Amino acid sequence: MKKALITGITGQDGSYLSELLLEKGYEVHGIVRRVALEDPSHRMWRIRHLLKDIRLHAGSLESYPSIHKVFMEVRPDECYHLASQSFVSYSFEDEFSTLNTNINGTHYVLAVLKETNPGCRFYFAGSSEMFGKVHEVPQNEGTPFHPRSSYGISKVAGFDLTRNYREGYGLFAVSGILFNHESPRRGFEFVTRKITYNVAQIKHGLTKELKLGNLEAKRDWGHAADYVKAMHQIVCHKEPDDFVISSGETHSVREFCEAAFSFAGLRYEDYVAVDKALFRPAEVDVLTGDSAKARKILGWKYSRTFTSLVEEMVEADLRFMTDRVKA
């Protein structure tokens, strides 16, 4: 039985990836902060249904000895490094912790693998935010990086570290450059979930206004459940390589609002207000991915529609809010 170790297992991607690997017969391990183990009902809500099937280890990406200890205990065949400070807006507020956690954390994991388990296959969670101020549309594996946030910068550094350990030390170390991917398990701080959650609140009469930043920002949104399948395919490919994973379609925040409110029988114009304070210091105006390489080489497929993704998220939040109101 193969063993997989996931950092960031309590997050959106970690939960879907855990489900996928369990279905494939893996022994799944995850690294979590000790505070999560002490408060699982709140901090591990995405993987609550999996707790009997996975094994969790207390550890911190900011501590090399901590990471070393976990890897020595688990000895994984595959490592999926998903953990990071991933909220772009927050990276402008706290650059130091974003850079420290995301860059040093990645370096620690790679260094531990090189020292203790060089045969383990390593996956790094890259991001479309690495492209930032785009040089071409759509963006593919050859598009130059021009990050516009500390988060984007940290992901470029992680990508370069991963490539360096592959080329310099012979590790099977790969990156998936994933464009925005959402689901009902998305964090409440992200704009897509902020929209769908507030739609549910408005529908139940709990709030009357939703403040958002740049409504014209355009993103390539896909479903996280399909994107974790790509992660596994990248790791299982015969040769270590990097791949862009995306839907290939771009929609604006305004379009997301329109689809979300419309599904609930509402007009977004009646509730959404633009707040200039929510604009980023350096905006990323448009991101569109070209995943042709992944489709051709890995056979990865994405067939969901933008509308179905939005409606799934709204429907889940409407159910969540209905249960909350009843309680």
Give the label of every model feature segment.
Residues 23, 30-31, 59, 186-195, ...:
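C-terminal substrate-binding subdomain of Rossmann-fold SDR/epimerase-dehydratase oxidoreductases
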Residues 1-181, 225, 235, 304, ...:
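N-terminal Rossmann-like NAD(P)+-binding domain of SDR-like oxidoreductases, especially those catalyzing
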